[in-house]
Each structure stands twice: as C-alpha cells, then as structure tokens.
A protein has these predicted regions:
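Short helix/loop capping segments that flank catalytic or ligand/cofactor-binding pockets
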Residues: 27-28, 34-36, 93-96, 103-106
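A general structural signal for short secondary-structure boundary/capping elements
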Residues: 13, 72, 98-101, 129-134
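A contiguous strand-loop segment
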Residues: 1-42, 79
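C-terminus-biased signal that marks the final domain/tail of proteins
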Residues: 62-67, 76-79, 88-90, 110-164
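A cross-kingdom feature marking charged/low-complexity
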Residues: 95-119
Length: 164
C-alpha cells in the first residue's frame, strides 16, 4: 500500500485519536485472541469504525459509552480489543467486551490485559501487567516532561521481545 493510501485510510480506520472536544480514544489488544461478535439485534460496528464514530460524535466519556451501547461490537482484525477512552474533564475508562457483554471500568492506565471485573481480569502477558504497574505508580497531574518520562519507562526497548 502506498504511503498516500495509508494516510487516506488512517482517516477512516483510526486506531486512536483525539477530537476537538478533548475526547481521546485508543484501541489496544486486550490480552488474548478471543474475538468479539455481539449479536443482540443492534446495528453492527467494528472496533475501528467505533473509534471514528466516537471521535466524530462524542464530547466526553459518558457520551462515548452511550453511543457504544447502541451498537453490537465486532472485532476488526481477529484479536481481542479494549478501548481506552478519556475526556477533557479528567474522566477515563476502559471498555471491554467479554462473552458478548460490554463492560466499563474507570481507570487512568490501560495496557494490554483485561482490567474490568470479570473472569478474564488480568489475562494478558506479565509484561503488560508490569507496564501497567509502572504507569499506575505515577500520580497527580503530569506535564510534558513527566509524560515523556512515563512513556520512556515503559518503552518496548525496556522489555524482552518474548513476552508481548
């Protein structure tokens, strides 16, 4: 795929983004390869199109959750997903789909393992949980230098490639 085509595609199939109201949405793998296929009779939506929908229509976390509840979620690329959603008011959540049910949990940190209170809580790599613990140890407001340090502390180069 050409670079131009990739750039155009990214507009319609984002994996993360922030809108003008300050809503931030990111798609992360959730820790296993169980795909989501909700079948409740609502309109179907894939994880990547959900991100576009939320960035276009939601101003905050509550609006994002209300929008997601209107659709049946379906995995985009054959893996489990969870959505990290935060807004300009400081509210942040993770949305996960387990056994066809949408689960929501407040959290300031999301890595690549399940976080909601369900039978899959904690499923994912040890590295994911270690990165989560490292980031969760930071507290309070963070300026650009602190955010840079936080991201540097959990950079892939700091972890063995054998444990996701």
């Amino acid at each position: 795929m050409t670079e131009r085509m990739q750039s155009i595609t990214a507009i319609y199939v984002p994996l993360d983004g922030m809108n003008a109201k300050g809503l931030v949405v990111a798609d992360l793998t959730a820790g296993d390869d169980e795909e989501t296929y909700q079948r409740t009779g609502k309109v179907n939506l894939t994880t990547t199109t959900a991100i576009r929908l939320l960035l276009d229509k939601a101003a905050d976390v509550d609006e994002a959750v209300a929008l997601l509840k209107q659709y049946d979620m379906n995995s985009s690329i054959g893996i489990s997903h969870h959505l990290s959603i935060a807004d300009a008011h400081g509210k942040s959540i993770v949305v996960e789909y387990v056994n066809g049910e949408m689960l929501v949990s407040e959290t300031k940190v999301v890595t690549n393992h399940y976080l909601t209170d369900c039978e899959k809580r904690g499923v994912g790599s040890a590295q994911s949980r270690e990165r989560y613990d490292t980031l969760a140890a930071y507290s309070g407001p963070a300026g650009a230098p602190q955010v840079r340090d936080m991201l540097e502390s959990v950079a892939q180069k700091n972890y063995p490639k054998t444990d996701g």
